């Protein structure tokens, strides 16, 4: 998990990964949630763990979250501590981030927890097609046991060399986002992919 107080900060970190690590073709996860949502608390209560778990395989950015803020954000609240450093959340910055992402895409924030996947192709985010998991709908209908269990499964999926190879190759194709969706759903364990597909919890928006 990577803090992204603002949209601009997320883009800066993505560009740094491109320059420093050569990540030209990748997938970017944006975990839209708030501390007052039960589905968000599920991850925030173990944020230190998921920060280390997912950082090796896929970057999940957390809008409205950050560290080392000083007194610049009067609405900040402490939500977690990672490697001894306090992380904060700002509703104001969260709203600014989601509104900017709405302007960049056809996505409209539901008010609940969502996971958005954006393809990074030749070092640039492709905003014309995005993948969205509606996490609260998945929880209510029993498609997943918990958000934390789902992120654990996604992390295992992204650790798979065969899955990563499949996704990276698909990124360069015209129907990349459809192929990536298929690769993710196919490799989720315990038939979860079939359940998610039938329930329309995972959509392509363009």
Residue spans of the language-model regions?
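Well-ordered, non-membrane alpha-helical segments in soluble/globular domains
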Residues: 7-11, 37-50, 87-101, 140-154
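Acidic, metal/cofactor-coordinating or nucleic-acid-engaging core segments within structured domains
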Residues: 65-76, 89-93, 144-165
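Extended charged low-complexity segments that act as oligomerization/scaffolding linkers
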Residues: 61-100, 123-129
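Local sequence-structure signature of Cys/Sec-based thiol-disulfide redox active-site neighborhoods
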Residues: 2-83
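A short, hydrophobic beta-strand/beta-hairpin element that forms part of a small beta-sheet core
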Residues: 107-130
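Thiol/disulfide oxidoreductase modules built on the thioredoxin-like
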Residues: 97, 101-111
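N-terminal leader/targeting and pre-domain segments
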Residues: 1-25, 146-171
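Membrane-inserting effector segments that mediate pore formation, membrane fusion
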Residues: 168-206
């Amino acid at each position: 998990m990577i803090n992204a107080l603002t949209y601009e900060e997320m883009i800066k970190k993505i560009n740094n990964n491109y320059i420093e690590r050569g990540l030209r073709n990748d997938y970017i996860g944006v975990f839209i949630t708030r501390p007052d949502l039960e589905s968000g608390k599920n991850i925030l209560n173990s944020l230190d763990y998921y920060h280390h778990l997912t950082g090796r395989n896929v970057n999940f950015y957390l809008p409205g979250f950050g560290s080392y803020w000083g007194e610049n954000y009067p609405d900040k609240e402490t939500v977690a501590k990672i490697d001894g450093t306090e992380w904060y959340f700002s509703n104001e910055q969260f709203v600014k981030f989601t509104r900017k992402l709405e302007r960049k895409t056809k996505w409209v924030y539901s008010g609940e927890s969502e996971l958005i996947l954006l393809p990074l192709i030749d070092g640039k985010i492709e905003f014309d097609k995005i993948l969205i998991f509606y996490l609260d709908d998945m929880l209510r209908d029993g498609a997943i046991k918990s958000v934390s269990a789902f992120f654990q499964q996604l992390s295992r999926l992204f650790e798979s060399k065969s899955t990563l190879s499949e996704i990276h190759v698909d990124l360069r194709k015209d129907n990349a986002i459809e192929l990536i969706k298929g690769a993710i759903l196919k490799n989720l364990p315990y038939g979860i992919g079939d359940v998610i597909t039938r329930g329309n919890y995972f959509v392509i928006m363009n």
